[in-house]
Design a protein with these regions (language model features):
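Beta-sheet-rich non-transmembrane sensory/scaffold domains
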Residues: 1-275
Length: 275
């Protein structure tokens, strides 16, 4: 927070310590007045790619709800010193699953499930903030990062309704790989280079995760609780007509398109996709 008249720093908060995952704040912070325990608080909310929402008193910089520093996995890369902890807001709860969990993987059929597990086994997996790892020949191909660098929440930000204190947050559900490569020593003395960021693809061209692949969550910011969550639109035509999914009893209309699309959220909780 800066004083716009003088440029003076008023307060600040570091959302990710020693960032190794491209988890920079993806969108502009959102201003809004909410009522917490009967007291009006002028807030500023920052959504993150990690699928979290940091809410501060925009005058003082104090968190509206406690933010806990939790231990996180440490880097095993020689010379790297990752942060021992990362901040986790107590409220609102995370918008998406964080880190690696087998139950999140695609499970339309036993065969697709087995292939998804085999793909996941190619990566170093663990809780969110597991550090990037080198690509090993015949071994793991980097670290499973979930939510991926494109969210969680991302550039699209969110919408705040000042009449009722509701925040509507569009989200994407897709992991990515954080991989390190050993460079040519004739060209650099660096130990490792960051590999290009890629989505972790699922079996047979399908997403690696169970749907919904995009969704919107409505959060009552007065109490820091999610009220409802809905998928954003149907699955893509490619998924709907995928040969391995024909004849299965699947709800294609509520899987959420792999790419977030424009939508309108109505008071009755219905979602209308407009593009």
């Amino acid at each position: 927070c800066l004083d716009g008249r003088t440029g003076e720093l008023i307060w600040f908060y570091q959302l990710t310590h020693h960032g190794l995952w491209d988890y920079d704040p993806p969108s502009a912070p959102i201003l809004g007045d909410i009522a917490v325990n009967g007291r009006v608080v002028k807030t500023v909310t920052q959504l993150t790619k990690q699928g979290m929402s940091f809410v501060f008193d925009r005058i003082t910089g104090e968190p509206v709800w406690p933010i806990e520093e939790r231990p996180v996995p440490q880097s095993e890369v020689p010379g790297e010193q990752s942060s021992p902890t990362q901040p986790f807001p107590s409220l609102p709860p995370p918008y998406l699953s964080q880190g690696y969990h087998e139950e999140d993987l695609l499970d339309f059929t036993p065969e697709l499930r087995a292939e998804a597990l085999a793909i996941a086994a190619q990566y170093v997996t663990g809780p969110m903030y597991t550090p990037p790892t080198p690509v090993r020949e015949g071994g793991t191909q980097g670290t499973w990062v979930n939510p991926g660098y494109q969210g969680g929440a991302n550039w699209n930000g969110a919408a705040f309704d000042p009449q009722n204190g509701m925040m509507f947050v569009p989200l994407r559900n897709a992991p990515m790989a954080a991989s390190l490569l050993e460079p040519d020593p004739a060209r650099t003395d660096w130990n490792y280079l960051r590999a290009p960021s890629v989505f972790i693809q699922g079996p047979r061209g399908l997403p690696i995760m169970r749907p919904p692949w995009s969704l919107v969550t409505a959060t009552d910011m007065n109490i820091g609780q999610h009220i409802w969550s809905r998928s954003i639109g149907p699955a893509s035509d490619y998924i709907r007509h995928h040969p391995d999914l024909q004849g299965l009893d699947l709800d294609f209309d509520n899987m959420g398109h792999p790419m977030i699309r424009p939508f309108t959220a109505a008071a009755d909780f219905t979602i209308t996709v407009s593009g």
